[in-house]
């Protein structure tokens, strides 16, 4: 069982592949080390795919890979158990058949 994480924040919405960003002091900034607790995505077609690398580019270790949905306008929601998934460097998100992605992180 994980600990109670009380400082969860929503990322800046991604509409295409890119580094996960947060809002700090009213500005969008690339996130460094973080822990993804859950994700929400909106699909543009069947088989939406999300790959998240522990890096600032798609060259890093893949820590999350999800595929789901059967039609356009489906949503894909996933909650990671325990303390979520830790990214030591940053979180680079690759999206396919998805036009909106938000991660909830600590």
Language-model-derived ranges and their functions:
Residues 2-106:
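Surface-exposed, low-hydrophobicity beta-strand/loop segments enriched in small/polar/acidic residues
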